Amino acid sequence: MTSFNDGRTVRVVIPARYGSTRLPGKPLVDLDGEPMIVRVHARVRRALPDADIVVAIDDARIAEVLDARGIRFAMTDTGHASGTDRAAEVARVSGWPDTDAVLNVQGDEPLVPTALLQAFAGFCGAAPDLGVATVACPIDEVALLDEPAIVKVVVDHRGRALYFSRAAIPFCRDGRPADSAGSHGLFLRHIGLYGYANATLQALASAAPCELEQLEKLEQLRALWLGMPIDVMRWPDAPPAGIDTPDDVARVVSLLKRQTHDATEPY
């Protein structure tokens, strides 16, 4: 188990769903000789060597790969609609205390920086009143404000989320800034890394989807709808994108090869 400054214990769940419309069997896709889920687990383990890490799966084929490598996993309900639901099941079945922090690290992000994982674990572990936490970075290209695939978040003076949207928020009534969007400190891009107090995670997973969540297709809006505060940790830049399609595989493999050649972790 990992704790920070005598704070709360931090645990990690990596959801891995076998069925993917755009990339069937995604957790087991080969990335330069290793299945993707193995690489994600290795990245998390390198960042948090003492943490309790569980891969939440839904298929025996993933179990076989993980078992052969001695990686801890939990078989979860195949009917879950999201990784949050899988993380909640693992935390509940494992009997983790309500106050423990549960990090949800997406299983299709093999290039998530270890420094980001370490910083976020520390952020969640040290938070005195953790409910939900996530990450955002500056938007440094004005054009990204109009990109629906880039989720934007607006925060208050405490660093808590006011709203997430695929639309350009905040809206500039007098026209877009001429320089980089990020220089204003108001235009933030959401990074899909989450941390929860286990009690909050269970409450969130048991609640029905809200209308805003269904409209924007953004699960985190459920927490705001329920009145749950979301603390946003700022990070300087966006990590490399994860894997959703076959084209993404070649891009990630190229970055992995470069990383190995450089003997560093720039990605």
Curated annotation (Swiss-Prot):
Coiled coil: none annotated. PANTHER family: 3-DEOXY-MANNO-OCTULOSONATE CYTIDYLYLTRANSFERASE, 3-DEOXY-MANNO-OCTULOSONATE CYTIDYLYLTRANSFERASE, MITOCHONDRIAL. GO terms for cellular component: cytosol. This is 3-deoxy-manno-octulosonate cytidylyltransferase 2. It catalyses: 3-deoxy-alpha-D-manno-oct-2-ulosonate + CTP = CMP-3-deoxy-beta-D-manno-octulosonate + diphosphate. SUPFAM superfamilies: Nucleotide-diphospho-sugar transferases. GO terms for biological process: CMP-keto-3-deoxy-D-manno-octulosonic acid biosynthetic process; lipopolysaccharide biosynthetic process. The keyword Chloroplast does not apply. Keywords: Cytoplasm, Lipopolysaccharide biosynthesis, Nucleotidyltransferase, Transferase. The gene is kdsB2. Disulfide bonds: none annotated. It is found in: Cytoplasm. It is an enzyme of class 2 (transferase). Its EC number is 2.7.7.38. Belongs to the KdsB family. Activates KDO (a required 8-carbon sugar) for incorporation into bacterial lipopolysaccharide in Gram-negative bacteria. Its main location: cytoplasm.
